[in-house]
């Protein structure tokens, strides 16, 4: 069933496919603060209950997009005359929707990852070239002020030529566990966390370094989210899902769908339409993605990167250290210091605590002031939306196209291939035939930048820099 939408502003027209939680970032933007810049004219989903709920939420803001079943995707594009499609469906469906939209002559905005396998990367880029349209990947992490500032510092030459990066990301047992409940828990659906989650991180590294990876070797294992852990915690009587689990009250990684209005209305209330359970047991034997991963990368500009991702840490955050020939840049963020011990939902999160410190090779360290930001993902979501919908400048080149999306996903895809062969190195060129690289970055990433003079007065971020003392360890 569909009813042709009536645009509210005559602006660019958007259709949205895939109506899980993440879709509401875009739905609420186009029915709220960004509605003057774009009309939401179509909604599409495989679950009619989720579809009805999204229509209802839009109607509360007097926006009435047409509703379409997943099988009516092309009809939605024709009838709504959408200019662009926003793809927020499960990862394994991205390539299909992106290619179909491009063939229909539409631009595409897609959630990360671009897709989950190398063949689909090639397919998307070929379709984009043939169509002459544009694909944008929603890499919101680029937009957070702290990560943008890191890019500016590196580009300034403050630490000279970059030689190595250490990157550690910690997901806690609230956020991390969620990937083991949902469709992400199967490699064929998500590519595992090295694709679904780490595509953010590999994109940041690519963007910060102005390069792409040449070779990857990796190791992955399931160390925590497995039956043995549940047995060790005394959860011998665990069930298939949290809602019907005899061990629910004793499990510290349980999920109560009824405690969240959004989860209740989007998922629990609509299970009867497709049998999808949002709260499957995180310790189930059929899970085949890893919760502990490391990767060693060598980049085309000869930077070496060590990467570590764990999904069961006591707190959540990350630490990145850039080693350069003139010093180091360290960025450290605490997103959530701990998880409630009784398994209850986390309390409202405090603002992210982020520090950005430059340690010159000779001299005292200084801490940079990070511009304030509002909203999720370090303020990245709000800034990304303002740029995506066309009313904010992008002087730092944060917008990511399908090439950037492919080359970040390919790192995770190559890492998975390495793990499957016992850690053997995998050359990305063997996977990337036909996948163009993003536009190259200029100096300071070449050797000529290693010992050039750093003129602090040229860079606004130095105006509020504060010298600090760092104790030796």
What residue spans do the PLM features occupy?
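Beta-strand-loop-alpha-helix segment that lines the small-molecule cofactor/substrate pocket
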Residues: 5, 79, 84, 90-91, ...
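Catalytic cores of eukaryotic secretory-pathway lumenal/extracellular enzymes that build
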Residues: 21, 49, 68, 95, ...
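Conserved SAM-binding strand-loop segment of SAM-dependent methyltransferases
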Residues: 65-72
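Glycine-rich, N-terminal phosphate-binding loop of Rossmann-like dinucleotide-binding domains
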Residues: 88-89, 169
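Short Gly/Pro-enriched turn/cap motifs at secondary-structure boundaries
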Residues: 194-195, 283-287, 310-311
């Amino acid at each position: 069933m569909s009813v042709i939408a009536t645009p509210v502003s005559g602006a660019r027209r958007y259709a949205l496919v895939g109506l899980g939680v993440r879709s509401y970032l875009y739905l609420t933007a186009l029915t709220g603060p960004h509605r003057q810049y774009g009309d939401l004219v179509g909604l599409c989903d495989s679950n009619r209950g989720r579809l009805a709920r999204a229509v209802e939420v839009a109607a509360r803001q007097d926006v009435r997009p047409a509703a379409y079943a997943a099988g009516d995707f092309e009809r939605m594009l024709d009838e709504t005359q959408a200019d662009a499609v926003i793809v927020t469906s499960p990862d394994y469906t991205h390539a299909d929707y992106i290619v179909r939209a491009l063939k229909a002559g539409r631009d595409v905005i897609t959630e990360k990852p671009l897709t989950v396998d190398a063949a689909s990367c090639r397919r998307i880029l070929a379709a984009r070239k043939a169509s002459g349209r544009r694909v944008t990947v929603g890499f919101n992490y680029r937009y957070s002020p702290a990560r943008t500032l890191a890019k500016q510092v590196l580009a300034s030459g403050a630490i000279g030529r970059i030689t190595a990066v250490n990157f550690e990301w910690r997901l806690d047992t609230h956020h991390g566990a969620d990937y083991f409940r949902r469709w992400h828990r199967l490699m064929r659906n998500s590519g595992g966390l090295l694709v679904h989650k780490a595509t953010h991180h590999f994109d940041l590294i690519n963007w910060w370094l102005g390069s792409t990876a040449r070779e990857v070797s990796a190791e992955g294992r399931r160390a925590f989210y497995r039956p043995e852990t549940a047995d060790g915690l005394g959860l011998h009587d665990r069930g298939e899902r949290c809602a019907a689990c005899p061990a629910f009250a004793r499990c510290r990684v349980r999920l109560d769908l009824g405690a969240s209005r959004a989860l209740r209305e989007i998922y629990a209330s609509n299970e009867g339409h497709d049998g999808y359970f949002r709260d499957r047991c995180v310790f189930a034997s059929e899970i085949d993605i890893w919760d502990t991963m490391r990767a060693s990368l060598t980049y085309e500009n000869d930077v070496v990167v060590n990467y570590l991702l764990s999904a069961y840490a006591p707190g959540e955050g990350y630490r990145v250290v850039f080693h350069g020939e003139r010093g180091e840049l360290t960025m450290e963020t605490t997103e959530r210091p701990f998880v409630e011990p009784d398994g209850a939902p986390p309390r409202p999160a405090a603002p992210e605590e982020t520090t950005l410190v430059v340690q010159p090779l000779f001299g005292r360290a200084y801490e940079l002031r990070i511009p304030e930001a509002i909203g999720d993902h370090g303020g990245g979501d709000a800034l990304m939306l303002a740029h995506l919908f066309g009313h904010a400048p992008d002087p730092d080149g944060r917008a990511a196209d399908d090439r950037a999306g492919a080359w970040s996903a390919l790192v995770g895809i190559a890492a998975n291939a390495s793990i499957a062969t016992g850690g053997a190195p995998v050359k990305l060129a063997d996977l990337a035939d036909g996948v163009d690289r993003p536009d190259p970055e200029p100096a300071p990433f070449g050797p000529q930048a290693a010992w050039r003079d750093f003129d602090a007065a040229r860079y606004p971020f130095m105006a509020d820099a504060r010298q600090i003392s760092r104790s030796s360890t």
